[in-house]
């Protein structure tokens, strides 16, 4: 299924987004790896999740086809502010959020700073948490941080990163790699790792009253599975779903199961 993109100005940046389906709004926020974008992260989920709801997917600043670099400040504060401004720009007062990695941390920050604008949260391999046992930084994070170093971006470096996003490397296709390499030259990925404010787990997560579905791949090599424990322990209405033989991209590797799981979670009264 092809999706037609739209453009809107958000805080001075021309922002690409997709708006599919009707009903209660659900906003999908992508991760922060090289070449990431809303469509490249959620291509396998938009059609299924939009069957009963309005699904909105946008590119964060510095990613995909959204103009501009991130403003100065703590990373998740900046992205949370941008997300709320995006909601204002397209006339969405309140939404459920589905966020992967960087997008999960951004979703959490929106809920922390503007809880009245959030219905439910779905967090996959969420950034901003803290591993309990696994050594940090992970191999995946180190490869991301090195992507623009030395001779700069390359297909070999990108492949090395993407292979760590998944358990089954056959799911990383040539078209996906080409799409992400083209976008990667516009990515703000190095800037992200130099910024403060990555530790959302230090925030008052116990204040969140939203129903929250935490999703993790057991073999996640970017944000390890044991990073889910603090979120599960501190967010009062959180539940955890773990996929075996799955990496950092649960929404991609386990797309059919993930779509059914999330749709059921969002549909519950």
What are these model-derived regions, one by one?
Residues 238-269:
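Catalytic active-site module of serine/aspartate enzymes centered on a nucleophile-bearing elbow/loop
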């Amino acid at each position: 299924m092809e999706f037609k993109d739209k453009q809107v100005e958000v805080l001075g940046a021309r922002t690409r987004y997709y708006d599919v389906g009707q009903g209660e709004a659900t906003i999908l926020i992508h991760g922060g790896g090289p070449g990431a974008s809303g469509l490249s992260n959620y291509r396998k989920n938009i059609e299924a999740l939009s069957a009963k709801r309005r699904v909105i997917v946008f590119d964060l600043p510095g990613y995909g086809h959204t103009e501009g670099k991130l403003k100065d400040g703590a990373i998740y504060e900046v992205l949370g502010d941008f997300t709320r401004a995006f909601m204002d720009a397209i006339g969405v007062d309140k939404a459920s959020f589905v966020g992967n990695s960087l997008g999960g941390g951004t979703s959490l920050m929106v809920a922390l700073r503007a809880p009245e604008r959030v219905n439910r949260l779905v967090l996959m391999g969420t950034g901003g948490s803290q591993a309990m046992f696994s050594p940090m930084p992970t191999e995946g994070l180190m490869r991301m941080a090195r992507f623009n170093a030395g001779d700069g971006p390359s297909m070999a470096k990108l492949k090395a990163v993407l292979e760590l996003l998944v358990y089954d490397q056959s799911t990383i296709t040539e078209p996906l790699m080409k799409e992400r390499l083209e976008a990667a030259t516009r990515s703000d990925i190095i800037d992200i790792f130099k910024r403060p404010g990555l530790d959302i787990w230090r925030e008052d997560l116990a204040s969140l009253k939203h129903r929250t579905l935490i999703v993790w791949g057991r073999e996640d090599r970017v944000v390890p599975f044991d990073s889910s424990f603090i979120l599960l322990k501190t967010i009062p209405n959180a539940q955890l779903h773990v996929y075996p033989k799955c990496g950092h991209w649960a929404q991609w590797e386990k797309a059919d199961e993930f779509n059914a799981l999330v749709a059921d979670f969002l549909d519950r009264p």
